[in-house]
Structures are given as C-alpha cells and as structure tokens.
C-alpha cells in the first residue's frame, strides 16, 4: 500500500508507581554487603539483578505468583533471592527481599509484621 502507514502492533509497557519499604532496602543492602565481602564487585551485580526484578513487577505487577495472602514473589535472576511485594491500588509495594533457603513461615511472619510499619 503506497503512501499508507501501518499501525504498530508493539505493546506499550506502563510502569506502576513503586514503594520500597525500609525492610526491603535493608534486606538488599545486607545481602549486597555479604556478597561483596566474599567477592568484590558482586554486590553491584546483585543490586542490578534485584533492580531488574523490581522493574519487571512495576511493568507487570501480576507476574509473581501469590505466596501468602496479598504477597507475591518474583525470583531474582542469578541469585537465590525472591522479591516479595503486594499490589495496593495501582501501586507496587516491595516488602522484603529474602533468600530462598529461608523458612517460609518466618518470611510470612516478617511480611505480616512489616505491614504495620510506616512506609519509607
């Protein structure tokens, strides 16, 4: 069709607002420090992988399966961690970043107790 235009079929990805709770920031810093003491430079790579997981959930909030009540989880690429979050209205709230070997009951307790803390 000469001179015509074709509509793009590409999907536009819209990011949802994001809140990262203090506990999640602490979890990421603590894990990054642990990795850095074992192999310099690894902390930055860990943080980039966590950031990629968070970017995914801001674009696709329902990407992670429900784990406990309102809490969902996406796995961090290349590291044995999960980002635990909830969707509150249109906002993605990251509550914690926990190692996959951690006791699921302990994670649930931490997530449930954290919901009463003020947001960062």
Language-model features: where?
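Arg/Lys-rich, positively charged N-terminal/basic patches that mediate binding to nucleic acids
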Residues: 2-47, 120
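Enriched for short, Lys/Arg-rich terminal
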Residues: 3-13, 44, 82, 86-120
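Basic/aromatic recognition patch in beta-strand/loop cores that engages polyanionic ligands
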Residues: 5-8, 52, 56-93, 97
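Residue-level signal for well-ordered alpha-helical positions
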Residues: 31, 60, 107-110
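Short, charge-rich, low-complexity interaction segments located
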Residues: 39, 61-68, 102-105
């Amino acid at each position: 069709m000469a001179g015509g235009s074709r509509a793009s079929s590409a999907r536009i990805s819209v990011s949802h607002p994001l809140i990262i709770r203090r506990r999640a920031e602490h979890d990421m810093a603590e894990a990054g420090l642990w990795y850095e003491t074992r192999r310099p430079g690894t902390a930055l790579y860990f943080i980039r992988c966590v950031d990629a997981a968070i970017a995914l959930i801001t674009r696709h909030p329902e990407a992670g399966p429900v784990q406990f009540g309102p809490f969902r989880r996406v796995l961090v690429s290349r590291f044995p961690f999960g980002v635990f979050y909830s969707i509150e209205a249109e906002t993605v709230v990251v509550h914690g970043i926990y190692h996959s070997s951690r006791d699921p009951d302990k994670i649930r307790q931490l997530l449930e107790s954290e919901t009463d803390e003020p947001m960062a």
